[in-house]
Amino acid sequence: MGVFSSPMSTLRWVTLFAALLSLLEWGTAHEDIVMDGDQVVQQQGRSCDPQRLSACRDYLQRRREQPSERCCEELQRMSPHCRCRAIERALDQSQSYDSSTDSDSQDGAPLNQRRRRRGEGRGREEEEAVERAEELPNRCNLRESPRRCDIRRHSRYSIIGGSD
């Protein structure tokens, strides 16, 4: 006779089919969540891009008293959980720019000697830049946290200029 000859075996097959169907449906829903999660991560990665803070890098480089309106708008559009990381990267880029302009100096001395001559002044400039970067969300009057970033820095200049 057939597989579905008794009502009990028909019920078992229907139950098994329903269980497999629900398991398959759950797996598809789970996959969608993971894919959505990947998309969120990708979007978050893009929103953490320090290139989106070009006006803020200008603020960090030029040491203005207040960031420009454009800088604050760029920061406002950025995802709150990415702001400090992007600000730190923008600070790194602005300091890389500053040190590359050092190498173009015409005084003929090697770069690390020029840095050592400026020594304390350069360290203070770097500390002030870090403070400006840490306070940037607050200076832009952003409502969401974080309103202050914790940026830990090690001076590149003390490492570079260690020996003669």
Swiss-Prot record:
Residue stretches of biased makeup (Basic and acidic residues): 120-137
Stretches with biased composition (Low complexity): 92-107
Keywords: Allergen, Glycoprotein, Seed storage protein, Signal, Storage protein
GO molecular function (one): nutrient reservoir activity
Disordered, as annotated region: 92-137
Family matches, as InterPro entries: Bifun_inhib/LTP/seed_sf, Bifunc_inhib/LTP/seed_store, Napin/2SS/CON
N-terminal signal peptide: 1-29
Pfam families per the UniProt record, alphabetical: Tryp_alpha_amyl
Keyword match Glycoprotein: yes
Tree of life domain: Eukaryota
Alphabetical list of PANTHER family matching this protein: 2S SEED STORAGE PROTEIN 1-RELATED (PTHR35496), 2S SULFUR-RICH SEED STORAGE PROTEIN 2-LIKE (PTHR35496:SF4)
Record-stated family: Belongs to the 2S seed storage albumins family.
Protein name: 2S albumin seed storage protein PINP1
Naturally occurring in which organism (per UniProt): Pinus pinea
Gene name as annotated: PINP1
